[in-house]
A protein has these predicted regions:
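Domain-level signal for soluble alpha/beta catalytic cores
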Residues: 16-309
Length: 309
């Protein structure tokens, strides 16, 4: 997904000498995962046939290709294309202890839809002693991007993304210890918070916290509670990186999952502690574009201009 944003608000970064943002009317970046190149897709479907070094080589090559594509397109803020993730958030469950990973899809036939993704059972205390892997992904991106930074007239800005705790909680089944989705979210919150702190310590200049579940369910949920959860998640990194959140309505096999309206998010989501909000626009034919002005009074707005669906 290609995004364009009009940079105006940098209030949380006013005292950060390490942050560099180009003076220009529009900044461009990407959201979400690039498609896997054929070699990485083949490796991901035949892991037993490859050694660990083979997999690392395939991933490095895929990140290099995604990065090269973004640079040749002239994007201002680049990512690793999430080439080491099988999904923007599903891969993170492999880092969690205290869960039993769901195996095969609960439904394999019929039209593609969200009910083809199963959920994981919670078997104990939710922990992530190895982190969530995002810091290692960012270190790989830095190493690959290093030579490309030389000789550039403008700084090359690298961005990382991590799903927020409410979105992560969506694929975990409640139990006696964690009786509902909010209890699961609270258990995941410090795990995500620690990952964000690790990314900032690694030198991440731009950081997106993906919370599409909040935008999907804003129409029938306590949006003030969402804001409280989000702000507690990011409070330790506010002012230390350019912070954004991505709000969309789902894109599993080209299908939305949530009520596709921005209106239910406002005005409460304007209290998010972020410099920028990403809003889904292109695949909704720029419906509610008038809402951008309302958001822009409080923070920068990044608008999706390429329809990935």
């Amino acid at each position: 997904n290609i995004l364009a944003s009009w940079p105006k608000h940098t209030k949380t970064l006013a005292n950060n000498p390490n942050f560099i943002m180009k003076e220009q009317p529009l900044r461009t970046t990407v959201i979400g995962s690039y498609p896997f190149p054929g070699w990485l897709l083949h490796a991901s479907e035949n892991l037993d046939a490859f050694g660990s070094n083979d997999i690392a080589e395939a991933q490095n090559d895929a990140v290099t290709a995604a990065l090269s594509d973004q640079l040749s397109s002239g994007l201002d803020v680049v990512t690793d294309g999430e080439q080491t993730r099988f999904d923007f958030n599903l891969s993170f469950y492999g880092y969690l202890e205290g869960i039993s990973l769901e195996g095969e899809s609960p439904r394999k036939f019929g039209p593609p839809a969200h009910d083809q993704r199963g959920k994981h059972e919670i078997t104990g205390e939710l922990l992530a002693p190895r982190g969530l892997g995002a810091v290692e992904e960012f270190e790989r991106l830095k190493n690959i991007a290093g030579p490309l930074r030389e000789g550039r007239e403008t700084p090359l800005v690298l961005k990382a993304s991590v799903p927020g705790p409410f979105t992560l909680s969506g694929r975990l089944l409640p139990n006696e210890q964690y009786p509902d989705r909010y209890a699961i979210t609270e258990a995941l919150l410090p795990i995500v918070q620690k990952e964000l702190e690790g990314l900032v310590a690694a030198g991440c200049q731009e950081l997106t916290v993906d919370e599409p579940s909040m935008s999907c369910y804003a129409y029938n949920s306590d949006t003030k509670r969402f804001v409280d959860i989000f702000n507690r998640t990011v409070e330790a990194v506010v002012g230390k990186t350019r912070l954004s959140t991505h709000l969309c309505f789902g894109n599993f096999k080209g299908h939305a999952v949530g009520y596709r309206r921005i209106a239910p998010m406002l005005p409460d989501f304007l209290d998010f502690s972020v410099d920028e909000i990403h809003v889904e626009m292109a695949n909704r034919e720029f419906a509610e574009i008038d809402r951008i002005a309302e958001i822009a009074e409080r923070m920068d707005v990044a608008v999706g201009i390429v329809d990935v669906k």
